[in-house]
Amino acid sequence: MLTYPAIDPVAVSFGPLKVHWYGLMYVIGIAATWILARRRVQRSANPLFTPAQVEDLVFYAAIGVVVGGRLGYALFYNFSGFLHDPAMLFRIWEGGMAFHGGLIGVLIAMYAYGRSQGIRFFDVADFLAPYVPIGLLAGRIGNFINGELWGKPSDLPWAMIFPHAGDVPRHPSQLYEAFLEGLVLLIILQWFSRRSPPRMAVSGLFLLGYGVFRFAVEFVRLPDVQLGYLAFGWLTMGQILCLPMILFGIVLLAAAYARRSA
């Protein structure tokens, strides 16, 4: 069993103002995405975007992540809590961001930005998709520091006892997701996007990869207490939301390569 590193959720304080690690991780993820995406267009011989457009796109996407993620959490995972306390939407430092809601927010943001610039939607999506895992990696580390979204009881050597989760060692499911949805998916998408794939293929691979990884980790992650398992004694809301992602990812990949061969 490993010892959980009880890190103070507050990274730094300025008098009454407290900067939480959870929010700081989102800032780090967004900043890293901006830096790497900007460097890509600067090094490209035929960039689809200018550096200034990258800055605008990342800004649009960041707004979509925060607004969509918070609304998605309220609607998908804690609707009764939202009805009881609507102000919870603004307390981001407490945790509670739903990836699937954030994804919807980013899709809307990309559509709006592409339309304003006269750029096709999947050109925007294929450009941004390889950088999304950076934010996922940072966000899951933020979950780990917060000591939330832990996994089921486990006797594996790397199991941990989390605060507020009793005295039972558990899967550090946040780190599983950080590794799979963050690091592994980042490497796969960066490699794949540099092999001149057809339009829609990068977006499709992102949806498929994230959906499969998240669906798998949900088997060892405890569901949100207010929802529990929704069917069969194991199916979670996260898995239900991943199923259309997996299906749509396969459809996009098949359509992308069918169009290329045609």
Curated annotation (Swiss-Prot):
One of its GO terms (cellular component) is plasma membrane. It comes from the Bacteria. It is a multi-pass membrane protein. One of its GO terms (biological process) is lipoprotein biosynthetic process. Belongs to the Lgt family. HAMAP family: Lgt (MF_01147). This is Phosphatidylglycerol--prolipoprotein diacylglyceryl transferase. The lineage of its organism: Bacteria, Pseudomonadati, Pseudomonadota, Gammaproteobacteria, Methylococcales. The gene is lgt.
